[in-house]
Amino acid sequence: MNNTKLMSEYYKDDGSVAKVYQIVTGMDGERSFFSITYKDPNGVRLMQEDFPYKALGYVEDAAENWCKGIKLLTEG
């Protein structure tokens, strides 16, 4: 069972968005990780990136860096 909690949102000038979520796994709710969902200006999902061993600050920095054009999206 997974539950998601929106932690923060970061926007590009063109309306694209990076949403940072906390994903809680397991029945006890004690295990979790952070994830970013990237969407284009029309709301179409571009990619999801999971960060299972990173702190919230690290993940939020990654989302902000994408919005600033510092981080590029690469799958794989």
PLM feature segments, named:
Residues K19, E30-F33, M47, D61, ...:
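Intrinsically disordered, low-complexity, compositionally biased regions/tails
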Residues S16, G29, P41, T74-E75:
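Intrinsically disordered and other compositionally biased segments
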Residues M1-S35:
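Short N-terminal "domain-start" leader segments
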Residues A63-C67:
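Short amphipathic C-terminal alpha-helix that caps PH/PH-like domains
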Residues L6-E9, P41-D61:
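A short, exposed loop/beta-hairpin motif centered on an aromatic-Gly-Thr core
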Residues G15-Q22, F34, N42-R45, G57, ...:
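Residue-level marker of intrinsically disordered, low-complexity segments enriched
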Residues M1-N3, K68-G76:
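Short intrinsically disordered terminal tails
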